[in-house]
Amino acid sequence: MSMKKVFFLITAVFFISGHLLLFLIGQYYLNIEFFYLIIIGFFVLSASASWLMAWEDNYLFRFIYFISGIWVGVILNSLFLFLIFYFLNLQQYIDNLAFWFFICQIPILIFEFLSAYLIRVRKIEVRIKDLPDYWDNKKIVHACDLHLGPVWRLSFYEKLVKKINKLQASAVFITGDLFDGMEADFSWLNINSFKIKATEGVYYSLGNHDEMLGSKTVNELLGANGIKVLENDMLEKNGLQIIGLNSFHHLKYDIEATIIKQLSYSSSKPSILMLHEPVSLAKIQSLGIDLQLSGHTHGGQMFPNNLINKILYLGHDFGLFKKGDFHLNVSSGAGTWGPPLRLFSRSEIVEITLRKK
């Protein structure tokens, strides 16, 4: 089954179940009359938003897409608020429960949008065995999951580039999903003032959304901006092996066979692996990889996805993890997918200081 079909099925299940859940909350907990009409209206709006954007990229359709994203946020927030209201038994103390239930959404939505829009810099330090003197005390940047498309566009990308360039990193590693997967005009990426600058290069590995846009298109867009795309490939830079593997969604493959047999990888040399998802950690550690950079999880982005991610990725859904000489950094990403909102997560890039162990 192709990535587009999988994406469609997951989105359809989420939309239908989410709207059904909101209907049950509104109809039987908040006792809102004719609530099903509101649900049907927004369901049609949300379902049509992606189709409209695929048909034509214009201001009106982007606005509809944005509103549908906010509506998805309202659905997720409704589950969060319902749990709070229900377990605190607030229905016994509040008159006009439905009014206050949805009034509470306003400050939450504002907070969530700011958490998504304002990109923080998370700073960490990684000690690597036998790190070449050249890289000792050098700073690199890890970015991922910007999801440029209908919502996050030119101004947001410009802000990200300025924030990265301000850090004056020696190298920048982007672990996939710079694009949202929808076809759009990205000609503005060729503006020189918006190019990411790093003395030792900017490197990219494909994410699952990159397959929907097409690896050829991604290569053309990024190549024109001096970004090196590593598709199951490796290069060595001043004694440091830099490996980029395709997303597991993009292509199922054996990691050991790919790294050991196809590439000139040496476990005796220090290495950085770019892999979109934080998966196959035990296998990667056994290969002697020093630092794996991943994203994809968005740090959960919104409740209850943060709890689901912790289960799916066995706790390796966000942050820096260390086991022996192996390090894993999972970033929550610089952008969002679906709702342009974040709850219990932040948009970020990661500044990593490399030190010799």
Place the predicted regions along the sequence by residue.
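Non-catalytic terminal accessory segments
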Residues: M1-I119
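N-terminal signal-anchor transmembrane helix
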Residues: L60-I67, N89-C144, G149-L167
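Conserved beta-strand positions that form and line the central face of beta-propeller blades
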Residues: I70, E125, L320
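Soluble catalytic domains of enzymes that build or remodel membrane lipids, polysaccharides, and related
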Residues: L131-K357
